[in-house]
Regions:
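Acidic, surface-exposed loops and disordered segments
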Residues: 1-201
């Protein structure tokens, strides 16, 4: 299996270095490894068989990986397989007053450490507020800049029917937004302005 990066799914305005698209490709690869094991196949992953793309260019059309499947009865299955269809993005409000303990954080980062990656936790209230401020500022820039907002608007999925039909994109499950859209009171392509109802929503 040769996995290539779909040029039609690139986001040059909001993902200019292809970080998100490559994360998505990586997720597919890992799912393929897990599913292959479930079916009794060992999946060998050969990353970037034609060479890694230029870091300053979007990876459209690039071969991201070659997957070689070999029947292997000794391949161990992964308990995560049964959870794949249950995965979803948690968009609930998080309680930032709760602090993750050192032992909890250690167990969360253990898989990353196995691959030589490092991670850290932001638990101090002052540091949390700094991260929030950066996030708010970044969000405002993306929402109030026409070229970045409109790129995202084309990927908005409003209400249950759109979210079910299109399994990609930016889902907006809010009942209020769905109702306003149904009655023609919410235009996803209207560029928000600071203080406007669209920006507030």
């Amino acid at each position: 299996i040769l996995l290539t990066c779909d040029k039609e799914r690139l986001l040059p305005e909001t993902d200019p270095y292809g970080r998100q698209i490559l994360i998505g490709c990586g997720a597919f690869i890992e799912l393929a490894v897990i599913a292959g094991a479930e079916l009794g196949y060992r999946v060998e992953v050969q990353p970037f068989p034609n060479g890694a793309p230029d870091l300053k260019q979007l990876p459209g059309g690039s071969a991201v990986a070659r997957l070689v499947l070999t029947k292997d009865g000794a391949t161990k299955t992964d308990p995560l397989f049964s959870q794949i269809r249950r995965r979803h993005t948690n968009k609930n409000v998080y309680d930032s007053s709760k602090v993750i303990s050192s032992s909890q954080w250690s167990s969360l980062t253990a898989p990353a450490r196995a691959f030589g990656l490092t991670g850290g936790a932001v638990n101090q209230r002052e540091a949390i507020e700094q991260v929030r401020n950066i996030t708010r500022s970044s969000f405002e820039v993306e929402m109030l800049t026409a070229r970045t907002y409109l790129e995202s608007a084309h990927l908005m999925r409003i209400g249950p029917s759109e979210i079910t039909q299109y399994r990609d994109g930016i889902s907006l499950p809010s009942p209020m937004v769905n109702a306003l859209s149904t009655f023609g009171l919410f235009d996803r392509f209207e560029i928000p302005k600071t203080g406007s109802s669209n920006f507030t929503r």
